[in-house]
């Protein structure tokens, strides 16, 4: 299991995943990322025409790499620090539980 998969599984089990996801959503909204991506989607749909032959899956495939590059470094760093804090706190709690008789 990769480190990212282990962290993902751990945060789901502890209930911290939803907190991290909520933080990410709020930060992306605050910095205008969601509006940028929404505009990008709109522009792509206008370019591709209105004949409904462009699927949601195709839109996601085209937008995802561009959208990922638009996430501000500050947001990435904040989330990484939050994840590290959660893992550290939970590791300390586990160590304390092992020490108890």
Curated annotation (Swiss-Prot):
One of its GO terms (biological process) is heterochromatin boundary formation. The keyword Transport applies. One of its GO terms (molecular function) is TFIID-class transcription factor complex binding. This is Enhancer of yellow 2 transcription factor. InterPro entries: TF_ENY2, TF_EnY2_sf. Component of the nuclear pore complex (NPC)-associated AMEX complex (anchoring and mRNA export complex), composed of at least e(y)2 and xmas-2. Component of the SAGA transcription coactivator-HAT complexes, at least composed of Ada2b, e(y)2, Pcaf/Gcn5, Taf10 and Nipped-A/Trrap. Within the SAGA complex, e(y)2, Sgf11, and not/nonstop form an additional subcomplex of SAGA called the DUB module (deubiquitination module). Component of the THO complex, composed of at least e(y)2, HPR1, THO2, THOC5, THOC6 and THOC7. Interacts with e(y)1. Interacts with su(Hw) (via zinc fingers). It comes from Drosophila yakuba. Gene3D superfamilies: 1.10.246.140. Belongs to the ENY2 family. Transmembrane segments: none annotated. It is found in: Nucleus, Nucleoplasm; Cytoplasm. One of its GO terms (cellular component) is cytoplasm. Keywords: Activator, Chromatin regulator, Cytoplasm, mRNA transport, Nucleus, Protein transport, Transcription, Transcription regulation, Translocation, Transport. Involved in mRNA export coupled transcription activation by association with both the AMEX and the SAGA complexes. The SAGA complex is a multiprotein complex that activates transcription by remodeling chromatin and mediating histone acetylation and deubiquitination. Within the SAGA complex, participates in a subcomplex that specifically deubiquitinates histone H2B. The SAGA complex is recruited to specific gene promoters by activators, where it is required for transcription. Required for nuclear receptor-mediated transactivation. The keyword Transcription regulation applies.
